[in-house]
């Protein structure tokens, strides 16, 4: 026979919870000896909703305490190794409302990049079965129509969070590197029979780092066109912290150059682009629509206000 403290340790419960279960006759064979309960060595842990939820489990009873995902922007890692607040209902909201292009403005450290990576992992076509990262999340309980969207689209993902330089040349070089890396994620296009030779030549220029500024401004439009041809469906384009290089340009005296570049860059991606399923942008500020999103009438702005 064992006492409540010993059973509590074995079952991962508090001693008080085990004592209450004994009082309610929920543990077979438990008997009270004086002021203490004695429980058979082979007693079975009772099925109880409060217990399976983990609400009463103590850290001291063997539960591993997870760290907070501070500075973690990798969705797969965050939901597996850290305390993760389920934000997957954001996916349902998009699929219900179907805004073509969405802009999210939030202060720093509001989880913008993590949420965008969540969208990428959910929607992106992958050789890996990525549904396993959502099967225990809220979105998976919303029905087949939402589950059927998982892993069904090519995705273009860029984050400008580290584009912080003192000159336009250094900024453009970094953007060139980011595009080179993103094009590299889609190497299947280089050998695709559905892609024209002139498109493969352009693809190679980006991959080899030989693209001019004009080539770079057209890169999102070109890449989305090639992905549509290859996969037979238009991609989702995600741009994280789009305004970081713009803020740097404003403070470092190359604002005109970065605004001119971004206007053409985003116009090709989001304005009248038939090769686009959804577009998502995040940033701290909402740059005046006239300066950078000129003519983009399908932009839905989501702010904290």
PLM features: residue spans?
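Short aromatic/basic micro-patch
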Residues: 1, 38, 84-85
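Polyanion-binding surface elements
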Residues: 1-17
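A generic structural signal for ordered secondary structure
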Residues: 4, 29-30, 48
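Ca2+-coordinating acidic residues in Ca2+-binding motifs
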Residues: 6, 43, 241
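Short polybasic/polar patches that bind polyanions
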Residues: 9, 23, 229
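Major-groove DNA-recognition helix of helix-turn-helix-type DNA-binding domains
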Residues: 12-38
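A short, Lys/Arg-enriched interface patch at domain edges and termini
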Residues: 42-61
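Phosphate-binding site recognition
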Residues: 59-305
